[in-house]
């Protein structure tokens, strides 16, 4: 019978969150998790809870600019995505969050 079990969850700091945000696209999830000494599932869950996208889109600044301008002109996300050959999610990230 085990009576003295402790929960060893990591207490996430602001620095941890800033590290993740700064290294998305530069390091893999596995590398970031290793550096922070956490499981990849814990890192993914933390990122999801704090609205940090771990998806890496390799989109040029010019294409991002075009997406924003097309959206300002009234085009729908799905139309822009089709024209730019991007996913709806990628275009939404660019347009709404300034990715």
Swiss-Prot record:
It is found in: Host cytoplasm. Induction: Expressed in the early phase of the viral replicative cycle. Expression of early genes is repressed by viral Repc (latency) and favored by viral Ner protein. Keywords: Early protein, Host cytoplasm. GO terms for cellular component: host cell cytoplasm. It comes from Escherichia phage Mu (Bacteriophage Mu). Its main location: host cell. This is Uncharacterized protein gp9.
